[in-house]
Amino acid sequence: MTPEQFNTFCASLPHSTHVVQWGGAQVWKVGGKLFAAMWDGDAPNAGITFKVTPLAFELLRDQPGLRPAPYLASRGMKWIQRVSAESMNDEELTLYLRQSHELALARLTRAQRQALTSSPAP
């Protein structure tokens, strides 16, 4: 998935916002909660990072082309990073990105979710 495809897909998810941070990463949030990030190029952490359920983390963590996300997974959080498309194609990746968005949205307070739904999506 190219950076353009990644950004276009993430932008299509309701109430998602984009920032560039952490040394040039394309970072996507919903209600201020991170749901996906992409580091491009030759960075040691190059790849697409997304939040997963505990079960998905156990299933995906040792698959070729996937790994526990640096920093996030080392802190006990359930985040996966796709570094190549060996065992997860772009179509599957978009399903996980959508689920990551839903997981982040679910972590918002009721008031935060209401504020998002009562204001127009950016």
Task: Name these PLM-found stretches.
Residues M1-P122:
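Charge-dense, helix-prone N-terminal extensions
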